[in-house]
């Protein structure tokens, strides 16, 4: 099970710039609050990030109309950038090889309809058994994939780049491989070594 932004596609910076552009008119404090939360909560829905901003900046909940408007502005600001984003090094080769051996899934914090549009347009949908996004949380998505297909959690691998991804793996009882730095977890700067990592795992019953 792979996250999308920062795991399959190098799209994290695209979304960081998009977040900044949507709240720039609210001032530098708003930008700082939103980007700090965004960077430390990868894999969390954009709508939850805007809710956090409103609570911190104004001490109240954001109204649904404003939330929807910000979500639409964000989607418009980042869609083309995500469409052009390159693969994370090693990701494309891993996916093409791994799909011949195991069922692959995507679990992302991006709204599901938008995520599927991106994957359809880029010709990626057919590489995966399922492509899933928000509003369900990352933990719910991973648990749902495991339950629906009766997979053994201990034989399921979550590949992510955020503490949200790691928390989802821990909640599900699955293995985890991080893109980036994850103390005490198997991880690397990219996905070029992911297949070797999987091939080095002990076989069931061994």
List the predicted regions and their residue ranges.
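Active-site neighborhood of HAD-like aspartate-dependent phosphohydrolases
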Residues: 1-36
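Conserved SAM-binding loop
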Residues: 8, 104, 158
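Short beta->alpha linker loops
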Residues: 14, 45, 86, 90, ...
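Helix-loop "lid/cap" segments that line or gate small-molecule binding pockets
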Residues: 20-24, 45-62
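Short helix-capping segments at alpha-helix termini
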Residues: 25-30, 58-62, 123-127, 150-151
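Short, acidic loop-to-helix structural element flanking the phosphoryl-transfer center
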Residues: 76-106, 112, 116, 139-140
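Asp-based, Mg2+/Mn2+-dependent phosphohydrolase catalytic module
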Residues: 112, 116-206
């Amino acid at each position: 099970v792979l996250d999308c932004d920062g795991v399959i596609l190098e799209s994290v910076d695209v979304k960081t710039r998009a977040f900044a552009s949507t709240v720039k008119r609210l001032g530098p404090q708003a930008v700082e609050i939103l980007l700090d939360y965004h960077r430390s909560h990868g894999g969390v829905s954009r709508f939850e990030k805007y809710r956090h901003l409103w609570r911190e900046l104004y001490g109240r909940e954001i109204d649904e109309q404003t939330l929807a408007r910000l979500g639409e502005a964000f989607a418009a600001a980042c869609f083309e950038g995500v469409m052009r984003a390159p693969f994370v090094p090693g990701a494309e080769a891993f996916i093409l090889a791994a799909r011949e051996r195991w069922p692959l899934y995507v679990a992302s914090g991006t709204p599901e309809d938008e995520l599927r549009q991106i994957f359809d347009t880029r010709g990626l949908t057919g590489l995966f058994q399922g492509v899933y996004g928000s509003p369900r949380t990352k933990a719910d998505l991973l648990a749902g994939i495991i339950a629906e297909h009766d997979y053994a959690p201990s034989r399921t691998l979550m590949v992510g780049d955020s503490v949200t991804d790691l928390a989802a793996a821990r909640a599900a009882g699955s293995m985890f491989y991080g893109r980036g730095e994850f103390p005490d977890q198997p991880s690397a700067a990219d996905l070029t070594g992911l297949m070797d990592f999987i091939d080095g795992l002990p076989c069931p019953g061994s």
